[in-house]
């Protein structure tokens, strides 16, 4: 293992010490909680930082596994418009990732969902036995 790989592995282990990243694939519906920091200037000129968490729920249409630069693309329909957002898997901005539903798809990248709407954009649900889900949570 060279120096760069070792550095990336150490960095990943530091970033995942507090949070658990579940196994998910393209087609799964995930809920990503993101930390948002707002900066505002008060009347007396002081800068005020406020933190809040925002949930983003949608279907994973692509996943990119590249060690520390791994990312995934989530698509949701908001007010009739398709919205896509890419999240860096090991980013400190990503607070948590929860799998809501597991989907059955035959592709690794689901970019064809961009051209579909309504019933044709649905994804079948994959049922996982209870024993596996309990073992994964423990």
UniProtKB/Swiss-Prot annotation:
GO molecular function terms listed in the Swiss-Prot or TrEMBL record: structural constituent of ribosome
GO biological process: translation
A GO cellular component annotation in the UniProt record: cytosolic large ribosomal subunit
Keyword Ribonucleoprotein in record: yes
InterPro entries, alphabetized: Ribosomal_bL19, Ribosomal_bL19_CS, Ribosomal_bL19_sf, Translation_prot_SH3-like_sf
Cell wall biogenesis/degradation is among the record's keywords: no
Keywords of the record: Ribonucleoprotein, Ribosomal protein
Pfam families, alphabetized: Ribosomal_L19
PANTHER family given in the database record: LARGE RIBOSOMAL SUBUNIT PROTEIN BL19M, RIBOSOMAL PROTEIN L19
Family stated for the protein in its record: Belongs to the bacterial ribosomal protein bL19 family.
NCBIfam families found in the cross-reference section: rplS_bact
Function summary: This protein is located at the 30S-50S ribosomal subunit interface and may play a role in the structure and function of the aminoacyl-tRNA binding site.
Protein name as catalogued: Large ribosomal subunit protein bL19
């Amino acid at each position: 293992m060279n120096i760069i790989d070792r550095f990336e592995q150490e960095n990943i282990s530091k970033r995942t010490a507090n949070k658990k990243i579940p196994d998910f694939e393209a087609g799964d519906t995930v809920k990503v909680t993101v930390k948002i920091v707002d900066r505002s200037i008060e009347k007396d000129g002081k800068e005020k930082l406020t933190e809040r968490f925002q949930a983003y729920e949608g279907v994973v249409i692509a996943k990119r596994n590249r060690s520390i630069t791994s990312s995934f693309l989530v698509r949701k329909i908001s007010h009739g418009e398709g919205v896509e957002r890419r999240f860096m898997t090991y980013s400190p901005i990503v607070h948590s990732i929860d799998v809501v539903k597991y989907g059955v798809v035959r592709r690794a990248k689901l970019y064809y969902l961009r051209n579909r709407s309504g019933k044709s954009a649905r994804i079948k649900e994959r049922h996982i036995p209870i024993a596996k889900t309990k073992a994964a949570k423990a």
